């Protein structure tokens, strides 16, 4: 039931407040659209309710992606990269309770996350990456050394998932 309510709300918003042709022409998603999508929960579809997200299932996330894809590919890319390969999903799976409490509410409400994998000489092949994250002597940090070529959602992101090699 909650999934249906969200999908209907998203469908209505897309129809009445977005212009996919204009987004395609300009290559820009209006800031107001990003803000509105965050306020309606579209940035936190799978983020648990306890962290301010909608807490919906993968099925409902897929339904939203299909709806977005049938309306505007750019919005689909923004939301799917943010929630799947950006910060929220890795944080849900691998983050500490403290990290989840600090960051997930921000992403659920509209802060956008980015993803950085691609490198100049190796493309997007993680097995050949040259960027590294080596533990500090005390093991508390992993300083990153290297260079990434681009980042999905980077223009609008407040946090970025960086994919490096590590010795462990």
Predicted regions and their residues:
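Amphipathic, small/basic residue-rich leader segments at the start of a protein or domain
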Residues: 1-82, 89-113, 124, 142
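Conserved residues at the C-terminal ends of beta-strands
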Residues: 48, 118, 163
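Short glycine/proline-enriched turns and hinge-like loops at secondary-structure junctions
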Residues: 56-58, 125-127, 153-158
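Short beta-strand-to-turn element immediately C-terminal to the catalytic PLP-Schiff-base lysine
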Residues: 93-95, 134, 162-165
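A generic local secondary-structure boundary/capping motif
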Residues: 103-104, 121, 130-132, 149-152, ...
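A gly/ser-rich beta-alpha-beta helix-loop segment of oxidoreductase catalytic cores
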Residues: 114-135
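A short, structured loop/turn motif at beta-sheet edges
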Residues: 134-142
């Amino acid at each position: 039931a909650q999934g249906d309510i969200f999908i209907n709300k998203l469908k209505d918003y897309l129809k009445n407040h977005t212009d996919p042709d204009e987004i395609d022409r300009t290559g820009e998603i209006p800031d107001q659209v990003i803000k509105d999508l965050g306020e309606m929960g579209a940035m936190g579809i799978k983020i648990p309710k306890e962290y301010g997200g909608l807490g919906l299932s993968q099925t409902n996330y897929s339904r939203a992606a299909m709806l977005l894809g049938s309306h505007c590919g750019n919005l689909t890319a923004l939301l799917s990269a943010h929630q799947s390969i950006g910060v929220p999903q890795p944080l849900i799976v691998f983050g500490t309770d403290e990290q989840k409490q600090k960051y997930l509410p921000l992403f659920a409400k509209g802060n956008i996350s980015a993803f950085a994998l691609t490198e100049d000489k190796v493309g997007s092949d993680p097995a050949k990456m040259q960027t590294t994250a080596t533990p500090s002597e005390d093991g508390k940090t992993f300083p990153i050394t290297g260079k990434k070529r681009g980042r999905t959602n980077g223009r609008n992101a407040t946090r970025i998932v960086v994919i490096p090699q590590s010795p462990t």
